[in-house]
Amino acid sequence: MTGGSVLKDRDRLGRIAVFVACLLPLVWYGARFVGGDLGANPIEAFTRKLGEWGLIFLLASLAATPARLLWGWTFPLRRRRMVGLFAFFYVCLHLLSYIGLDQFFDWGAIWADIVKRTYITVGMAALLLLVPLAVTSTRGMVRRLGGKRWIALHRLVYPAAVLGVLHYMLMVKADLSEPLIFAGILGLLLAVRLVPAVRRRRSGRAPS
């Protein structure tokens, strides 16, 4: 077996491992939901867990570049697209659970919630920002848009992540500890990305 084939096999195994790992939360909480093991309000708990994991995967996709900058890890970059698509997948399931299980497809009530409840308005805005990112995630779309335009478009992931964390914070009624942890992680990830850009800008300035 050649070195190239070994690397290909490792890459394939890595893709499979990440794919399976990303499905595990859905399997775990889906089984608990069906088995009636999610507390007194299983629909709310199931819907919330789907949203939490969507946010976790979104932050994980944002962590790929900081992992390379800080520790030289390239594996997260190779799996960033898959993890980002799973983030979108879980966010969509979060929305579908709210629409179908919580509201029973009562579109009038759903629209009223979007208009009147700030956390739902913010959550919908975050989802809408993620839609073009998911649609243009393929290599073919990168070629169609061109590298610069594609990169500019995919910077929408940052406001989407901020809105996702804000949605979580507004949704929680009492204990803000978990949303604040998410906010702290997002802040660190954004800070790590900003530091090299600031250094490049400063080094590019000619001394007066």
Curated annotation (Swiss-Prot):
Cofactors, names only: FMN; heme b
Top-level lineage group: Bacteria
Main location: membrane
Organism: Rhodospirillum rubrum (strain ATCC 11170 / ATH 1.1.1 / DSM 467 / LMG 4362 / NCIMB 8255 / S1)
Molecular function GO labels: electron transfer activity; FMN binding; heme binding; metal ion binding; oxidoreductase activity, acting on diphenols and related substances as donors
HAMAP family reported for this sequence: MsrQ
One Gene Ontology biological process: protein repair
Record-linked InterPro entries: Fe3_Rdtase_TM_dom, MsrQ-like
Topology with respect to the bilayer: Multi-pass membrane protein
Record's GO cellular component terms: plasma membrane
CC cofactor note: Binds 1 FMN per subunit.
Subcellular location: Cell inner membrane
Keywords associated with the record: Cell inner membrane, Cell membrane, Electron transport, Flavoprotein, FMN, Heme, Iron, Membrane, Metal-binding, Transmembrane, Transmembrane helix, Transport
Protein name per UniProt: Protein-methionine-sulfoxide reductase heme-binding subunit MsrQ
Species lineage: Bacteria, Pseudomonadati, Pseudomonadota, Alphaproteobacteria, Rhodospirillales
Subunit structure: Heterodimer of a catalytic subunit (MsrP) and a heme-binding subunit (MsrQ).
